[in-house]
């Protein structure tokens, strides 16, 4: 795992000395995030931040928030986007979501909310386009692993998926 974290930090995003790094991930990945953050620092990062995303909360947001709230962008979120557009941190997206995590939610409501948010966030995303380093890396989560290896226990499925990723 250490080698994988090093590969992401040094080749995936190619950290520049003093650069800020943001790791977008699920809370299930705390152990790997710790390894990855350390490898980013060893590669020269000036600051490493974890941006936690929790799919069960997203599911509840879709279910209970009004379309206006769900499609809105808070002032602090917009300020963070502005900061990112100005400072161009390296972004690491750790993909480990439950493939079925949003099943049964109102997909039309979710799509409309994402479109509304995009109208607000687009100028910041456009400002970053082709100007910052980013990397998407797979990190097995239990539900994803169980989807791939349903006959195995959660832990065994996760270990097996790690084996395939690290080949």
Question: Language-model segments: what does each one mean?
Answer:
Residues 1-167:
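Active-site bordering "gate/hinge" segments
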């Amino acid at each position: 795992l250490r080698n994988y974290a090093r590969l992401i930090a040094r080749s995936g995003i190619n950290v520049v000395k003093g650069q800020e790094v943001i790791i977008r991930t699920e809370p299930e990945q705390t152990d790997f995030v710790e390894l990855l953050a350390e490898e980013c620092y060893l590669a020269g990062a000036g600051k490493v931040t974890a941006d936690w995303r929790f799919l069960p909360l997203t599911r509840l947001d879709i279910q209970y928030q009004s379309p206006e709230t769900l499609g809105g962008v808070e002032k602090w979120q917009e300020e963070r986007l502005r900061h990112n557009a100005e400072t161009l941190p390296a972004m690491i997206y750790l993909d480990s979501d439950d493939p079925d995590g949003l099943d049964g939610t109102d997909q039309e409501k979710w799509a409309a909310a994402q479109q509304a948010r995009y109208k607000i966030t687009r100028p910041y995303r456009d400002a970053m386009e082709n100007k910052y380093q980013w990397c998407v890396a797979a990190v097995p989560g239990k539900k994803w692993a169980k989807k791939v290896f349903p006959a195995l226990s959660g832990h065994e499925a996760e270990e097996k998926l790690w084996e395939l990723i690290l080949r």
